[in-house]
Amino acid sequence: MADSGNPNENNPSTDTGVNDAVSTSHGDASASYDASAITVLEGLDAVRKRPGMYIGSTGERGLHHLVQEVVDNSVDEALAGHADTIDVTILPDGGVRVVDNGRGIPVGIVPSEGKPAVEVVLTVLHAGGKFGGGGYAVSGGLHGVGVSVVNALSTRVAVEVKTDGYRWTQEYKLGVPTASLARHEATEETGTTVTFWADGDIFETTDYSFETLSRRFQEMAFLNKGLKINLTDERESAKATAGADEAGEDEKHEVKSVSYHYEGGIVDFVTYLNSRKGELVHPTVIDLEAEDKDKSLSLEVAMQWNGGYTEGVYSFANIIHTHEGGTHEEGFRAALTSLINKYARDKKLLREKDDNLTGDDIREGLTAIISVKLAEPQFEGQTKTKLGNTEVKTFVQKVVYEHLTDWLDRNPNEAADIIRKGIQAAHARVAARKARDLTRRKGLLESASLPGKLSDCQSNDPTKCEIFIVEGDSAGGSAKSGRNPQYQAILPIRGKILNVEKARIDRILQNQEIQAMISAFGTGVHEDFDIEKLRYHKIILMADADVDGQHINTLLLTFLFRFMRPLVESGHVYLSRPPLYKIKWGRDDFEYAYSDRERDALIEMGRQAGKRIREDSVQRFKGLGEMNAEELRITTMDQEHRVLGQVTLDDAAQADDLFSVLMGEDVEARRAFIQRNAKDVRFLDI
């Protein structure tokens, strides 16, 4: 979540970021990986001047992208069958060390450069084993580009390679070698260690998020069967967290670490995602693998239906999450829809007069992982995360149809349960359509007939308009008085909306508060959703800064994630951050604090400046309704001063899992989540 604006401080601008770029090569994975396999395309000069072109941003996302680039190289070694363990360590001084047990970056001289291959890989853009075709058959990330970019954007890089019977080292400063490659003692071990320190003059922050890295590494471990990825945080802050809930002194010196290793690969991934979904429709995960060696194309699919109402199909190409789908997803969906309908009719589960099940009916409650690996992927779409290779659709459709036909024939009882669930979804869809038709006739879902309680803005330019979703009439009244009516709309809602995690679409559309939001946004919902019709480019959830307020926000986010996900993916959803305290030094001298820590810091700074504070000088806001219109305007609504958190979606599978835990039926999973994360909560307002 990215913050912008603050009445008390200047924050860095919102980090927009872009998705990882991807490059791969064709060739025989068993081909030699030596200096001759390294090819050079262009120089590295521009990277420090325009880092955003290479890593997307210089904010948090770009910083974590550096780690990803180095780890991608190690994963390439695993994909080629030469590595099975990757160790990532966040060092006490903020550096990051990545170690793998692969073959080691070659140290021989690259003929065209007259330098050791490892130095070329680290100092020349687009120099890497994938481009010439001799090093990797399939690879993900930006191998070659990534490591040299990491070098260019770091104050210091140290590389250690074990290869050709020796240990070799070299160091770099601001992308330039400080000395020649040095050969050390003989060793039979192989592998590469890259340690780097991101440049604080380039990045807005050099503080890595353990959670962000661990989520991505867990996903990578799921997608690379048998690969072990260890993440360790040696920073003092992590040590303090690790021992914060322990009585003994020794525990305070523990480091924070996680290890991910899945022999079942994506089968374990599906099991993990479905473990929070409640009852399963069938006990075993359906899995299949296939390969077309002539086309350097392979496929893995794992899938299982649960008793929930939402679809969770996630696709990957060369381990890169294809957020926008593509030909592999199209092939999967086409095979699934045609086969399930054919099977249902052959087994008389669908009668002659019944309509075919739609793809949405069939995929209700389905959790599936589709992972393809190919030599030359073509990426399309707005964020270059949509696979475009036409040959992939044909391959996936044929393989899924054949394997799933066999599974259905061998498991007739489970097959019948799957189809019955699809039929129930179809009945709900028909009921929802009738409900939509009825509400459309009444004008309840149409933006042409806006909800009566909406205080709309005057502008018709969606890019400038924003809507505040405010809980409670009193807060809604203050918000109406404090808004800029030219660009700011207010929609008050009453109480907590329906928990959509536990309801089908037909029931959801009957909820008045949800009807009001759908109508106000103008996009439609679910299968009728059209983001081009969005009336406000900022949707701001404004709730009290207490537990009830956070619960309301979670309910709203669950609805938006499940039924209007493109709003979240496109960065249109924000959380307001109203202050918790008002500190009054005098009649016209006051400051706002957004946490207990900030309150204490402001009071201490005031005392040091000689300011006097009375006992009644610190006002605690228990709700938005306690603020007058002017206070709400200054702290929460004024675009120049407010603090907003942008809701971003870097990992849909992880977000899906989190919403299932927080809002689903599994009470034990929710309790375990709270216990596991309680030590990370510094200020709990109950």
Swiss-Prot record:
GO cellular component: chromosome; cytoplasm
UniProt cross-references to SMART domains, sorted A to Z: HATPase_c (SM00387), TOP2c (SM00433)
Gene Ontology biological process terms, A to Z: DNA topological change; DNA-templated DNA replication
Ranges in coiled-coil conformation: none
Catalytic activities: ATP-dependent breakage, passage and rejoining of double-stranded DNA
Biased composition (Polar residues): 1-27
Listed EC numbers: 5.6.2.2
Domain of life: Bacteria
Predominant location: cytoplasm
Binding of Mg(2+) 2, residues: 544, 546
Cofactor binding note from Swiss-Prot or TrEMBL: Binds two Mg(2+) per subunit. The magnesium ions form salt bridges with both the protein and the DNA. Can also accept other divalent metal cations, such as Mn(2+) or Ca(2+).
Subcellular location: Cytoplasm
Name of this protein: DNA gyrase subunit B
Note: Few gyrases are as efficient as E.coli at forming negative supercoils. Not all organisms have 2 type II topoisomerases; in organisms with a single type II topoisomerase this enzyme also has to decatenate newly replicated chromosomes.
Residues annotated to bind Mg(2+) 1: 471, 544
The protein's role, per its UniProt record: A type II topoisomerase that negatively supercoils closed circular double-stranded (ds) DNA in an ATP-dependent manner to modulate DNA topology and maintain chromosomes in an underwound state. Negative supercoiling favors strand separation, and DNA replication, transcription, recombination and repair, all of which involve strand separation. Also able to catalyze the interconversion of other topological isomers of dsDNA rings, including catenanes and knotted rings. Type II topoisomerases break and join 2 DNA strands simultaneously in an ATP-dependent manner.
GO MF, one example: ATP binding
Domain Toprim: 465-579
Annotated Pfam families: DNA_gyraseB (PF00204), DNA_gyraseB_C (PF00986), HATPase_c (PF02518), Toprim (PF01751)
Complex and partners: Heterotetramer, composed of two GyrA and two GyrB chains. In the heterotetramer, GyrA contains the active site tyrosine that forms a transient covalent intermediate with DNA, while GyrB binds cofactors and catalyzes ATP hydrolysis.
UniProt keyword Acetylation, yes or no: no
Record's keyword terms, sorted: ATP-binding, Cytoplasm, DNA-binding, Isomerase, Magnesium, Metal-binding, Nucleotide-binding, Topoisomerase
UniProt gene name: gyrB
Top EC class of this enzyme: isomerase
